[in-house]
């Protein structure tokens, strides 16, 4: 079971409280918790791919961290990016590999 998400409220609670509520309670509270349909690890892989393809690097870094918590290894993260580079763009891979190095370190 995923831990309770509070990032929306922590970062946007005063500025956009309804958005923060939807982020924490619906997206992470309801969708991400449906582990019978997809594991948190699989959801992390899908989310990493989606954020990579859109070039949303701040969110991508956050989800690389979350993916690591969900069991995605450094080698798997590298392979995800290598695969996606051919479909989404080589420069995106170059932008993402330093994030992987930062998140995973020398593992």
Regions found by a protein language model. Name each.
Residues 1-41, 65-69, 93-107:
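Acidic, glycine/proline-rich low-complexity segments that act as flexible tails and inter-domain linkers
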Residues 58-78:
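Mid-chain, well-packed structural core segment of small domains
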Residues 41-42, 59:
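Residues at the start of alpha-helices and the adjacent loop-to-helix junctions
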Residues 42-51, 80-81:
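Short, structured motif recognition centered on aromatic/hydrophobic residues
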Residues 52, 66-70, 83-86:
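Short basic/hydrophobic patches in alpha-helices and adjacent helix-turn junctions
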Residues 50-56, 88-89:
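Short alpha-helix boundary/capping elements
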